Amino acid sequence: MALAISRGFETALTKRELLNQGFSMKPELIPGDFDFQNSIPLWTPDKAKQAIFREFAFADFKQAFRFMTLCAQYAEELDHHPDWSNSWNKVTVHLTTHSSKGLTALDIQMAKAMDTFAIEAMR
């Protein structure tokens, strides 16, 4: 099953579908020379934590909650969940792939989706 085609994101298979096709549950790490600035310019790489980080700021709690709801629904589809916290209008996010002990394409895909959901939540 392709995910989030209607939102224009890259397609991905769920972990269950990958297992059914004989693939490992452990996604491959992205290369060390990955161009974060070009791919996800609003995110900050944290090499020490093998993660990427971003703080989102919204007009109010309602927008922040809408953003988190959109992200949570997509995270469930992708079976890839952020480490995040919320304080009124701010949402702080760290993305990493724990099973791979570092950054994978799942993190980049989730970051791009979150950037889009932030814009959608502010409408």
Feature names for model-found ranges:
Residues 2-123:
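Charge-rich alpha-helical segments
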